[in-house]
Amino acid sequence: FPLVKAEWWERHQLLVSLAWALLFLVPFLFAYGAEATAEQLAEVIIGDYIPFIVLLMGLYVVAGGIHIGGTIAGTTRNNVIILLIGSFLASWVGTTGAAMLLIRPLLRANLWRRHRAHVVIFFIFLVANAGGCLTPLGDPPLFLGYLRGVPFFWTLEHIWPVLLVNVVLLIGLFVAVDRHFMRKEGRENYRQLELLTRADDRVPIHLQGWHNLFFLLIIIVGVILNGLIPQLGAFVDAETGRTFGVDVFGAHIGLEYVAQISLICLAMILSWLTTSTDDRSRNNFEWAPIAEVARLFIGIFVTMIPALAILRAHGGSLGLDSPLGFFWATGALSSFLDNSPTYVVFLTTAGALGTDAAGAVVTTIGTVDPSILLAISAGAVFMGAVTYIGNAPNFMVKSIAEGAGVKMPSFFGYIGWALAFLVPVFVVDSLLFF
């Protein structure tokens, strides 16, 4: 629909999303009854969708209140600095937060250029995707893994060498591509660059809405508490082995769940109330991007119920049992589906396999081989960059860039860039790590 009838799609996103959800729910209701349907729906909506969308919304609102001002000249060196800063920030404020925070300063810095699309493309590769691989705060797939028992700092401890290799390779490729396009700029463009670099006209780089950094810290604390509270005996019911709370159609709403949702919502509300309208308007803040994600993902999460059920039952017999296979299978599907449900599907498959390997990770859906978990995490996060629809921030960055006058590649044109620059990097990842 987005490719064929874009205008119709914009008006009917929620309708289409709910229609796909009903295509699963109605037959399931008749086959298994109301109770089983309610349990499956509650598990996905309460257990996955609500924490997922609340975290994304919290990061989006808080990061949208921070404005980076000042004169930045879009030279190769400065672009590399922004890409590196964004790649680091993405794991701590989310790929969505980092992308929304830095895309507009990057676009302003490069206004003097005619050729800007490649800068945005590498921004998507690094900031909107790869940089978010170190913590559950970084990218939604890892957050869903965290909700299923993957330790908060597991990815930080294990995936940083992969990230380091990818960042070094992609930055090197960016420098080569950027210098190529710099040579194509005309004299008038270079005169604009000279004006930007004149010391007497420069506005110092400054941060407005800096108090939102405190609200980001509150969000981080909320996510950490989700994993910490179940480990504290004082909050665990000795009879059930679960935290104190209530069950809604089998979905457990424990103290850790309430703490996380409450703190993120508190940070979001305080950010909205204490950030000036001017600061948000400088960032061109609007609700449309996060509303689109919320509408689409309600359908995605519901329709992944049967896939997860099949994989729980038959995941061990699919013939997928090597880290290399999981890396490419997870990545390939993450490119054309969203990477969040894809991650859950393959984590479920890995849990069904079971393992007694050293360092095995115990999750709520089974014990997972650490090398396979690394492959699933890397495949989902890194290959979410291969298409505009692979990860939530990709399309948001594209829309903002086009609004700023950048002529971005088409859907398939962007895939061409990814095939040329990302796939060779993934081949190196395969040779070194999987």
Model-derived segments and spans:
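Interfacial loop-to-helix junctions that mark the boundaries of transmembrane helices
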Residues: W8-L15, T37-I50, F152-V162, V203-L207, ...
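Long, contiguous bundles of hydrophobic transmembrane helices that form the permeation core
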Residues: L170-A238
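Membrane-interfacial helix-loop connectors
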Residues: V26-L29, A90, L101-H115, V119-I121, ...
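Transmembrane helical segments that form the transport core of multi-pass membrane transport proteins
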Residues: L216-L353
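Juxtamembrane and boundary regions of transmembrane helices in multi-pass small-molecule transporters
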Residues: L134, F153-D201, F382-F434
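Alpha-helical transmembrane segments
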Residues: E43-L56, W154-L173, V246-C265, W328-S335, ...
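Transmembrane alpha-helix boundary signature
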Residues: L3-E7, L25-D48, Y60-G74, F88-L101, ...
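Hydrophobic core segments of alpha-helical transmembrane domains in multi-pass membrane transport
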Residues: F1, W20-F30, L56-G64, G86, ...
